[in-house]
A protein has these predicted regions:
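Generic hydrophobic transmembrane alpha-helix motif, especially the helices
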Residues: 112, 116, 133, 143-222, ...
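Short hydrophobic alpha-helical segments within the ABC transporter permease transmembrane module
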Residues: 125-127, 169, 216, 224, ...
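Gly/Trp-centered helix-boundary motif
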Residues: 1-145, 149, 179, 266, ...
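Short coil/turn motifs that cap or connect alpha-helices
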Residues: 150, 160-161, 238-239, 251, ...
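Transmembrane alpha-helices
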Residues: 131-147, 240-272, 319
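Non-cytoplasmic
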Residues: 180-184, 188, 201, 205, ...
């Protein structure tokens, strides 16, 4: 009887130890999240970046709802259709600005940023181009994040030949220049460029996988030795659940920072691809495509290239500012 009581006591102690380890893990995660949020709130640079992201994402959501579900009802009711024209004279400069074709008196507040070579309102096309930029940034980064995180986590957790095979493949991918890899992917899988934007997003996601894989792998090497991972193994939890529920969440902080920065990179890369003709195709309203349309007018009407360039710059800087703030908050050694 005494032996049974002793065994029961030991079982309860082991169970409480394991539960305590998992509870401590959860508490640590919550404390880390609370600390990060507090640091972000104290960082004006990160707050400015967050504000830019909120504004651009809101604009993208409104534009997407109108384009996909309302078939541009909002655009035609309150502004102009972003794909069809002409709405006014072609190549009209911004309000109050003159060029060699038009005097400033010909400009109008109805088209505050002017019109393009087809007479379409530039401001409206900039507004609806936001949805392409934000969609590209989030979708391509999510693809790279998921693929790279799973690859790096599996390689770091198992080690040995699995690590060697996976990381050699990652290094081969990493050795190919980013832009060349994406262009080659688009040309190989969509030579007619009917779905060039879709394949550009997938290509950017694949090209960004090595960055995430290498980053999380280095973290997994230390996390896999933690007590809560050993406790889960002793409890008979399968490896895939240990990786998904314990290893990845506790290795994710630097990956989240990199993902924020990668969104800005993806927006910039796909805008460049659209400019080169390997991204969004006419008449899609995208910032890169607008730069492509303006390439022959940079000497006579430079505004056509300045406005989409400013939109790209502000959006990319916003994600970079927030990413820098997250990095500073995630690494106490950087704090003053």
């Amino acid at each position: 009887m005494a032996v049974d009581d002793t065994a029961g006591t030991l079982d309860r102690e082991e169970g409480s130890t394991e539960a305590g380890g998992l509870e401590a893990e959860e508490v640590q995660a919550r404390v880390g999240l609370s600390y990060t949020v507090t640091q972000i709130r104290r960082d004006p640079t990160a707050l400015v970046g967050l504000a830019i992201i909120i504004v651009t994402t809101t604009v993208a959501i409104v534009a997407t709802v109108d384009a996909v579900f309302l078939e541009y009802w909002l655009a035609e009711t309150f502004w102009y259709h972003p794909l069809r024209g002409p709405h006014a004279d072609t190549n009209l400069p911004p309000y109050g600005v003159s060029n060699q074709y038009y005097d400033a008196s010909r400009t109008t507040l109805s088209h505050p940023l002017g019109t393009d070579f087809r007479g379409r309102d530039v401001a409206v096309r900039l507004f609806y181009g936001t949805r392409i930029a934000i969609t590209v940034g989030f979708v391509s980064t999510t693809l790279g994040l998921v693929g790279g995180t799973l690859t790096g986590a599996v390689a770091g957790y198992y080690g040995g030949w699995i690590d060697d095979v996976l990381m050699r493949a990652v290094e081969i991918l990493y050795a190919i220049p980013f832009l060349i890899l994406v262009i080659a992917f688009v040309v190989a899988f969509d030579p007619d460029r009917k779905n060039a934007l879709l394949f550009a997003m997938i290509g950017v996601g694949i090209a960004s996988m090595p960055t995430f894989a290498r980053l999380i792998r280095s973290r997994v090497f230390s996390v896999r030795e933690e007590e809560y991972v050993e406790a889960a193994k002793a409890a008979g939890v399968k490896d895939r659940w240990i990786i998904l529920r314990h290893v990845i969440p506790n290795s994710f902080a630097p990956v989240l920072v990199q993902a924020t920065l990668q969104i800005g990179v993806a927006i910039l890369i796909v805008a460049g691809l659209s400019f080169l003709g390997y991204g969004a195709q006419p008449p899609t309203a995208s910032w890169g495509q607008m730069l492509n349309n303006a390439r022959n007018l940079m000497l006579t009407n430079q505004w056509f290239s300045i406005f989409p360039g400013i939109c790209i710059m502000i959006t990319v800087i916003g994600f970079n500012m927030l990413g820098d703030g997250l990095r500073d908050a995630a690494d106490p050694r950087i704090q003053n």
